[in-house]
Design a protein with these regions (language model features):
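Sec-dependent N-terminal signal peptides
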Residues: 4-13
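A beta-rich soluble binding module of mature secreted/lumenal proteins
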Residues: 17-169
Length: 169
């Protein structure tokens, strides 16, 4: 029985590692942090508990003189119509396009800018985990042709775009 459990654990670990390696997590090679700051609307996202049932989601990034970044995520809970805000902080990572974001004490999560429009009009965001993916825009709606290009970029990187939830704006 112990041997069977060990085999199952090894197989599941191999499958998990293989599935994660199929995602291209490379970030953009350059980032003008000041230009990235400001308001971003959430166009689409993978489902996760901390944003479940949220609509009209947006993020506001503010660069402080000391290099820290203030983060304010907001949206409306579709179940009760209540406006919710989550205040956090971010810091730059080791590579362009990498940030570390925290909404609770000193617990930070990856925030990887996977693709970014040349004019900073839209961004594709992921993390080291394949469970997270967002499409952000400076406007509440993206032209369909642009959205389709972003979806193809995500698919080419190994993401399952059929799991994306389109966010009501």
């Amino acid at each position: 029985m112990k041997r069977l459990i060990l085999i199952v654990v090894i197989v599941m670990t191999a499958i998990s590692c293989n599935a994660q390696s199929d995602i291209n997590r490379a970030t953009v090679t350059s980032l003008d942090v000041e230009r990235y700051m400001g308001r971003w609307y959430e166009i689409a996202r993978y489902d996760h508990s901390f944003e479940r049932n949220m609509e009209y989601c947006k993020a506001q990034y503010t660069l402080l003189p000391d290099g820290r970044i203030l983060v304010e995520n907001s949206g409306v809970d579709s179940r009760n119509g209540k406006f919710r805000i989550a205040d956090g902080k971010a810091k730059l990572g080791d590579h362009p396009g990498q940030l570390r974001v925290s909404f609770f004490l000193f617990f930070y999560s990856d925030y990887n800018i996977l693709a970014l429009d040349n004019n900073y009009e839209w961004a594709l965001i992921g993390s080291q985990s394949p469970k997270y993916l967002w499409i952000l825009s400076r406007t509440q709606k993206l032209p369909e042709v642009v959205l389709n290009e972003i979806l193809l970029t995500a698919q080419d990187r190994g993401y399952d775009t059929s799991k994306l939830i389109m966010v009501t704006q």
